[in-house]
Swiss-Prot record:
The gene is pyrB. The lineage of its organism: Bacteria, Bacillati, Bacillota, Bacilli, Bacillales. It is an enzyme of class 2 (transferase). One of its GO terms (biological process) is 'de novo' UMP biosynthetic process. Pfam families: OTCace, OTCace_N. Carbamoyl phosphate binds at residues 49-50, 99, 127, 130, 250-251. This is Aspartate carbamoyltransferase catalytic subunit. Belongs to the aspartate/ornithine carbamoyltransferase superfamily. ATCase family. Its EC number is 2.1.3.2. GO terms for cellular component: cytosol. Catalyzes the condensation of carbamoyl phosphate and aspartate to form carbamoyl aspartate and inorganic phosphate, the committed step in the de novo pyrimidine nucleotide biosynthesis pathway. The keyword Transferase applies. InterPro entries: Asp/Orn_carbamoyltranf_P-bd, Asp/Orn_carbamoylTrfase, Asp/Orn_carbamoylTrfase_sf, Asp_carbamoyltransf, Asp_carbamoyltransf_Asp/Orn-bd. L-aspartate binds at residues 77, 160, 211. It comes from Bacillus pumilus (strain SAFR-032).
């Protein structure tokens, strides 16, 4: 079965195939092979982009979408995630896309349930579909990754986006730079080099900003102090390369990690990332569903969980 737990679980060839498929779908390729199949979305963490992006992707594929309120499920009664997935498998759901607040939650599922598991974000761990949409956005801009310099700024320590992107970008031939407060640094991440914010911005083809995850911090820095010291200000943006682009996984804290006027500037690709997310998730769902059919005959459904 083709689970999607981390970016490292995908080969370079598989990554490029997913980008190619997502690009074709964005250009209007019709895909009705999943029409009528059931997909269930279950979210245990607040989500706007991931949740609704998956729902739009599913509906574009012609699927029947079941959106479940996490507060009304038996998880609130103490049911394990494993038993929840097995229950859904038993009633005809054939794949799961899961977000859970626990790091590497998928280890209790992969190889133990009979349907593919797609990770939509695990704690401070990984966020592979976000990484894929970021890669698609970069690929659209530059036609590849080899030789590019991508700087990732902000809360590296708590960011599953940083963790996923740093690994895969390094593997695809890009140079990864990190920048941010010392308390946000992740010394366990071997895929980037820490440099001072101004130097990182000057060197970068892609300036990727991260949200401060206030919910994971006990001490908070003032918004204006953070922007002036570590964020992308108007003055810093003037030192970007002419063709450099600005990216952010969102939600964006305007005036904190990025000056408000830059969010929708000429160099920003923030909303294009969101657009690309729909097509990437269509490609991911199609891949999981089709590859699952290699192991299980008959019609199948897809289940999306976010915890």
């Amino acid at each position: 079965m083709n689970d999607l737990s981390t970016m490292s679980s995908l080969t370079k060839e598989e990554i490029l195939q997913l980008i190619e498929e997502a690009t074709a779908l964005k250009k209007g390729k019709q895909e009705l092979g999943l029409a009528g199949e059931f997909v269930a979305n279950l979210f245990f963490e607040p989500s706007t982009r991931t949740r609704f992006s998956f729902e739009v992707a599913e509906k574009k594929l012609g699927m029947n979408v079941l959106s479940l309120d996490a507060a009304s499920t038996s998880v609130q009664k103490g049911e394990t995630l494993y038993d929840t997935v097995k229950t859904l498998e038993s009633i005809g759901v054939k794949a799961c896309v899961i977000r859970d607040s626990t790091d590497e939650y998928y280890n209790e599922l992969i190889g133990k349930v009979g349907i593919p598991i797609i990770n939509a974000g695990d704690g401070c761990g990984q966020h592979p579909t976000q990484s894929l949409l970021d890669l698609m956005t970069i690929y659209e801009e530059f036609g590849g990754f080899e030789g590019l310099t991508i700087s990732i700024h902000g809360d590296i320590k708590h960011s599953r986006v940083a963790r996923s992107n740093a690994e895969v970008l390094s593997r695809l031939g890009a140079t990864v730079l990190f920048s941010g407060p010392a308390s946000f640094q992740d010394e366990q991440n071997p895929h980037g080099t820490y440099v001072q914010v101004d130097e990182a911005i000057k060197q970068s083809d892609v300036v990727m900003l991260l949200r401060i995850q206030h919910e994971r911090h006990t001490e908070k820095m003032g918004n204006e102090d953070y922007l002036s010291t570590y964020g992308l200000t108007v003055n810093r943006a003037k030192n970007m390369k002419e063709r450099a682009i600005i990216m952010h996984p969102a939600p964006v804290n305007r005036g904190v990690e990025i000056d408000d006027s830059l969010v929708e500037s000429k160099q920003s690709r923030i909303f294009k990332q969101m657009e690309n997310g729909v097509y990437v998730r269509m490609a991911v769902l199609k891949r999981a569903f089709q590859n699952s059919k290699l192991h299980q005959k008959g019609r199948e459904s897809v289940y999306v969980v976010s915890h």
